[in-house]
Design a protein with these regions (language model features):
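Subtilisin-like serine protease catalytic core
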Residues: 58-214, 218-221, 225-244, 248-252, ...
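Active-site glycine-centered loops adjacent to acidic/histidine catalytic or metal-binding residues
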Residues: 76, 436, 533
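Extracellular S/T/G-rich loop segment that most often corresponds to the catalytic His/Ser-adjacent loop
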Residues: 308-319, 330, 449-546, 550
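A cross-family glycoside hydrolase active-site/sugar-binding cleft signature
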Residues: 370, 401-405, 432-435, 459-460, ...
Length: 570
């Protein structure tokens, strides 16, 4: 009897969910004070496709089911917090990117070395400390709260027990800081490394050219002084001076002495301000002769989830980062991104950029879970994915997206699958993943997206509306006319992986638009970029899942991954 009632209840919930999903194409724009989608045609249609899955129509008819109250975990190469439409919702105030974590360890810095700061003789408002690089670093006293000292519990007066006499207490001790060091090139993507190297080389060439000009002027003056017209003989000292000038010129003109550029060295300072641990990075702008020249621009960063602030290494690289602290702040984690892939994926799922250019679920919040290792060219590892799954559970994600995949021999097995099953079945977190770009042959799906029954595997689809703006394909027949779209045929991309798996599973659950032009990392020097692949199809499906979860939460419908998957597949 109980099982029958449970079955009837589940059927009722599923019917309610289907009634929400079934929408009619919107014929006009619906205005809403918090709406983020437009039902009218737009010149941006096709850049970030939403009509193919009726996501645009769904949010137009249900403006408050736009993904709000849903948290999407993006397991990828990291998200740039400064990218367009990523940090805040459409109102510019409500946080969208609510946390950033690095599960690879590529940004970890050992800051276990402690030193006590000293008074700065040049400025009473500053303290100073010698960093591990050997540079003297200046710190603003205002960075500490008014009540913070290492001996804050010390009384201003001390009384001896024997005599009862009162003596003035010694001055409070200056605070301690923790120091670390990190090469900037260990954080930067390869494209940023090359750009910074070119910038540093141009600066070096300018300085070298100035020295060359000075030496050549000295040689010219020497030759004029001892020319035949002057009839003056050089002394041994004059000859040594000429030889010295010539030797300096030869060294400056010789390129063999040039070695590989190691890049900037970042001094990391971690301190407790009385409320939270904070970190400051010195040395990012190597155009300055003194790292303290940019003191006014430095912002002591707390863990990103607390204040949601981020820093930029320098204006040349435009590399944005956040920080976290581990092991009682003895390890500083610098969290950035290693390719624009993760930011692009996040933009497809939940970009907030007005009614025409928003992502599939613009009201959803994001958590950046970095699993692509910067030291390995953005490649993932088993340990990073396992940590990412555990982080998604710990941080309270509702759905996660993984646009990564590798080949495997045994489907539905391994440590990653065990953790994924526990996350899906025990914690009710839906796992959406790309199936791979190894098609069109059969049984080409990747793991874990196409090889695990607990994961919602997504293949890539291209519609006629996507072909024109993305690939400049106006028609695939000779009959071009007003109804040009009728000449196109929507289909899966030729390279989209196909099932079944070795154990007979389908491998692919659904198809979703596999291309988009949307936001990318600031360090690319671009606002948006075209990318295509099942990596782009998966976050689109993830955004659709977020829309349904948002509707279920608003309507009081219990959420479970099988219910959402069944509703989408049907």
């Amino acid at each position: 009897m109980d099982q029958r009632l449970h079955s009837q209840s589940s059927g009722t919930h599923f019917s309610r969910l289907l009634s929400i999903i079934i929408t009619r194409p919107a014929e006009h724009t619906m205005t809403d004070d918090e709406g983020t989608m437009s039902g009218n045609g737009s010149p941006y249609d096709g850049l970030l496709p939403r009509r193919e899955t009726q996501a645009l129509d769904f949010v137009t008819q249900h403006p408050r089911y736009d993904g709000r109250t849903v948290i999407i975990g993006i397991l990828d190469t990291g998200i740039d917090p400064g990218a367009h439409g990523i940090r805040y919702m459409a109102d510019g105030k409500t946080p969208k990117l609510i946390d950033m974590v690095d599960c690879t360890g590529s940004g970890d810095v050992d800051v276990s070395t402690e030193k006590r700061v000293e008074e700065c003789e040049d400025d009473v408002e500053l303290w100073q400390v010698k960093g591990l690089s050997g540079r003297t670093l200046k710190l603003k006293k205002s960075w500490w709260k008014a009540t913070e000292t290492d001996d804050k519990k010390e009384r201003h007066e001390s009384t001896t027990r024997d005599t009862g006499r009162t003596f003035p207490a010694r001055p409070p001790a200056l605070p301690k800081v923790r120091l670390g060091i990190k090469r900037a090139f260990e954080l930067f993507p390869s494209a940023v490394v090359q750009r910074v190297k070119r910038h540093r080389q141009r600066r070096l060439d300018r300085e070298t050219d100035a020295y060359v000009a000075d030496v050549q002027r000295e040689l010219t003056a020497w030759q004029e002084k001892f020319s035949a017209a002057n009839n003056k003989k050089p002394t041994p000292e004059d000859l040594r001076h000429k030889e010295d000038c010539q030797a300096r010129l030869d060294v400056l003109m010789d390129k063999e002495w040039e070695t590989e550029d190691p890049g900037m060295i970042l001094d990391c300072v971690v301190f407790h301000d009385g409320q939270d641990y904070r970190a400051v990075l010195y040395g990012g702008n190597d155009d300055l002769h003194d790292v303290n020249e940019e003191l006014d621009q430095l912002i002591p960063l707390a863990a990103y989830r607390k204040e949601r602030q981020y820093g930029t290494v320098s204006s040349v690289d435009q590399y944005n980062y956040a920080v976290n602290f581990h092991d009682d702040a003895s390890v500083l984690s610098i969290v950035g991104d290693c390719t624009p892939h993760g930011t692009h994926v996040a933009g497809i799922a939940a970009l907030a950029d007005g009614p025409d250019r928003s992502g599939v679920a613009p009201g959803a919040q994001l958590i950046s879970i970095k699993i692509g290792d910067s030291r390995l060219g953005s490649m993932e590892t088993t340990s990073s994915i396992c940590r990412g799954i555990m982080a998604a559970v710990r941080l309270g994600c509702d759905v996660i997206n993984l646009s990564y995949g590798e080949g495997c021999q045994l489907p539905n097995s391994g440590r990653i699958v065990e953790l994924a099953e526990e996350m899906v079945w025990r914690h009710n977190i839906m796992f959406v993943s790309a199936v791979g770009n190894n098609g069109p042959a059969l049984s080409t799906v990747n793991a874990p997206g196409g090889m695990s029954t607990c994961i919602f595997g997504v293949a890539a689809y291209v519609s006629p509306e996507m072909m024109r703006p993305m690939y400049s394909i106006t028609s695939n027949t000779d009959n071009e006319g007003e109804n040009d779209d009728d000449n196109h045929v929507g289909t899966t991309y030729t390279w989209s992986s196909v099932g079944p798996t070795a154990d007979g599973s389908l491998g692919v659950c659904v198809c979703a638009p596999g291309g988009a032009i949307t936001s990318v990392s600031n360090w690319t020097m671009q606002k948006s970029m075209l990318m295509n692949g099942t990596s782009m199809a998966s976050p689109h499906a993830c955004g659709c899942v977020a829309l349904l979860m948002s509707a279920c939460k608003a309507e009081g419908i219990p959420i479970s991954p099988p219910r959402i998957q069944r509703a989408i597949e049907n």
